[in-house]
Amino acid sequence: MTKNILIIGGSSDIGLEINNLATAEGHSVYATSRDEAVSNSYDNFIHLDPNQSLDALDDIPEDIHGLVYCPGTINLKSLQRLTLEDIKAEMEVNFYGAFNVIKKVLPNLKKNDGASVVLFSTVAANTGMPMHSSIAASKSALEGFAISLAAELAPRVAINCVAPSIVDTKLASHILSTDERKEASADRH
């Protein structure tokens, strides 16, 4: 059965890989990003900022089987350098955007028993790591939201939150720029 999958964060390497896997299985992917440069990577691309108007999502299919929320941020700063604006920006991307999108497409998800939402968190949300305060706070909010929402929407819609460590992507390239840095990151986890 062909399923309709909505990916928020389609310009991320993770979003692109999920698209590749889903389309290889014959599913229809609808991907969004604030970056229109990736539009040619998708059959169904939607230019969207999850914290602005979500009207562009009015054109997705009425039945969505899966939602993947995977926009990413890496803003590593000490507490002395961290500003309230930094925290707000992380919350906008990592938490408020997820809230906005899920609320908007929930009717589409509820049309399918067994629909699924996958949210991307980080290991930093539950592991004390230097200079990860803002991402840990925003992703912890996302995890708490996921747990409560899973209880609220079960058994019709499954809500899951995955928390990978740093992934070797363009977003993390400045952190994993040398073999030594990659090894240090691997040793940490």
Go through each PLM region and give its residues.
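Alpha-helical segment proximal to the catalytic Tyr-Lys
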Residues: 107, 150-155
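N-terminal Rossmann NAD(P)H-binding glycine-rich loop of SDR-like oxidoreductase domains
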Residues: 11, 15, 19
